[in-house]
Amino acid sequence: MQINFEPMPNSVTHLENNSPSRLKNNKTVEEHKEHEPDLQTQSEMRRESNGSPKDTAVTNQNGDQPHENVIHTQIIKKDNPFFNYMQDNVDGSDENGKNDDDDENAKNAGSDDNEDQLLQPNRRKNSKERRRSSVATSKDSSPDVPYNTLNHNASGMTKEGKKRAQILEASKVSEGQGRTYIAYAIKYGDSIVKRRYSDFESLRKVLVKLFPISLIPPIPEKQSLKSYGKAMTYSKSSYLLPTESGDSVDLSLSVINGPVTTNDEKLIRHRIRMLTSFLNRLLKNQEITKTSIVYDFLDPNNKNWNDLITSSLTISSLPKSVLQCNPIDPTNTTKAHSYLPVPSSSTQLLASKDNHSASDADEFTKIEAEFKNYEQLIHSGLYKYSRATTKEVNYLREDLKGISSEFAQLSTDETKNESGLAELLSHSSDAYGTLQEILETLVGNLHYNINEPLSECAHMATAVRDLIHYRRLKLIQKDILERTILYKRGQLIKFQQQENDHKQIDNMVKEELGTNGAVNLENPAGPQSYSGKFINKFTQLAIIIKDSVSYQEQDPAAAARSLEKELIQLDETLKVATSDLVVISETLKNTELPNFIKERDEELTQIFKNYAKYMKENATRNLEIWKELHNRIQEA
């Protein structure tokens, strides 16, 4: 396909490839449990904070004032989407005024501090270095657990070594006269470009025309600008990523990975994730990346995407309907494609159902039904019940938090009596508090790594059904052409028959008129015989018929010639439609559908593995807590 989009250079800035399965100093995830406070340490902290139920601001060991609703999610390097960003800050510390000639101990200490920041981004190591942000959570809030996209890591590169796009923030932009829109800052490589939702929508429409038989990933549904803009207005800086000059990686500041408190904020995050997935799926598509359209979309030099599209001769020359494009190369659409009918009425769609061949009904009709069933199973089945499970786990977390608080209050009351029951109640309070923290992490994992990927799988199934529906419309298109040709041929036979009838009538009239072509219609002087009267009546009737044929009906000969030319054009168009249908069917069966099924199976496998992993980790940690509580009760 030749498209007038110049591809961007293939130079890729070398980024350090940090394996997600390993941490600094070759420490595994399990070895970093030392960064998590043990049950005893948490017990001491909780005794101080829960000593009086009315005291909400209690100073902790570091001199901070812990907030009751602050998220304390343990983030390891493997799950940290900003690891590469922090690594760049560490490597470029000389730009911040630090001395590169520090001794080895200072370097090691700095490395440990940075590592601790990555592992526990929501905890302040030094109050003079950065200020801790307080984030209030509610029933709908979720801990900051990043969404691990398949085949992507946190360094901005895919496993294949290709760059990936990342939406850094969503901000409200004014375009004058009181009109505003939401702009998404997209980082690709070393460049950042801002695009609005209509730009994403326009890009997808163009891609559907340029690649009609390729699976184009979906984008999130268009939402009301009023509600969406309102969410952005009141979000302020709490939902923007850290600035480039910042030395903090506090995920609570991120619209992508931070905790959320309202449904509007969830909407913002959901749209950012869906649009990010849309761009990265396009960058993985080999057919689409052969052209430069996606790279032009990510190029900051093209500030106005709409102007670029409207000024492109390639895009403007495409037919309005994708059904009139050449499916192999829409930029090389022939004249015969312009004569293809565009099925628009529901009557045509319903009438075509009973006229398809048995083989087609057994093949693609069955495939479409299977994908429809798959979409329903994912969206109305797994996704629905997974969301319900996450909601119930979150409710359980809140209940455990309340139980922990009540045990702490009872422990305080029993302390006055100087009985051993106070210590047992304190241990129980600590255990329930730790359990709710574990469930907090589980809720975040289920929401971001299970629910949202399942929702994306359902949307991808919808895109596949749209592709199958396109093939079905092409089949209806071919059916309409066949019906039209049959009708036109019937009309041609009718006109040819009329022309023959007219010739016969003319011959009969000429025979009756005689060689001079005239007849005396006046009454003769003498009486006429019966045969003479009959001939006169027949002559008058023949003249009337000839006049009526000449002045009331279309010339059969001219109509027949016009139909013959039209049938020639229709036959050529039918050949094109038949050829297109064969190409579309083969591409869907042999390429697009198998590739989608393969990717779908990989994504679902990863989702189910994550689900089993999170549940196992939660159960293991629960068992450890209850065993530790049991041992303390036995010792008491």
From Swiss-Prot:
**MF GO annotations:** phosphatidylinositol-3-phosphate binding
Q: Matching SUPFAM superfamilies, A to Z?
A: PX domain
Q: Which PROSITE patterns match?
A: PX (PS50195)
Cite the entry's keywords alphabetically.
Answer: Autophagy, Endosome, Lipid-binding, Membrane, Protein transport, Transport
Key word Nucleus present in the record? no
Q: Which Pfam families match?
A: PX
Q: Which domain of life is it from?
A: Eukaryota
**Domain named PX: which ranges?**
160-305
Q: What residue spans carry the Basic residues bias annotation? A: 122-133
- From the UniProt record, give one GO term of the biological process aspect: retrograde transport, endosome to Golgi
> Where in the cell?
Endosome membrane; Preautophagosomal structure membrane
Q: Which InterPro entries match?
A: AH/BAR_dom_sf (IPR027267), PX_dom (IPR001683), PX_dom_sf (IPR036871), PX_Snx41/Atg20 (IPR044106), Sorting_Nexin_Autophagy (IPR051079)
Q: Does the keyword Ribonucleoprotein apply?
A: no
Gene3D superfamilies (UniProt xref): Arfaptin homology (AH) domain/BAR domain, Phox-like domain
Disordered, as annotated region: 1-68, 84-163
Question: According to its record, how does it sit in the membrane?
Answer: Peripheral membrane protein
Bias (Basic and acidic residues): 27-49
- Record-listed a 1,2-diacyl-sn-glycero-3-phospho-(1D-myo-inositol-3-phosphate) binding positions: R196, S198, K222, R271
Q: Where is the composition biased (Polar residues)?
A: 10-23, 50-64
Identify one Gene Ontology CC term for this UniProt entry.
Answer: phagophore assembly site membrane
The text of the family note is: Belongs to the sorting nexin family.
The written remark on domains in the entry is:
The PX domain binds phosphatidylinositol 3-phosphate which is necessary for peripheral membrane localization to the perivacuolar punctate structures.
Record function comment: Required for cytoplasm to vacuole transport (Cvt), pexophagy and mitophagy. Also involved in endoplasmic reticulum-specific autophagic process and is essential for the survival of cells subjected to severe ER stress. Functions in protein retrieval from the endocytic pathway.
Put simply, this protein is called Autophagy-related protein 20
Task: Name its species.
Answer: Kluyveromyces lactis (strain ATCC 8585 / CBS 2359 / DSM 70799 / NBRC 1267 / NRRL Y-1140 / WM37) (Yeast)
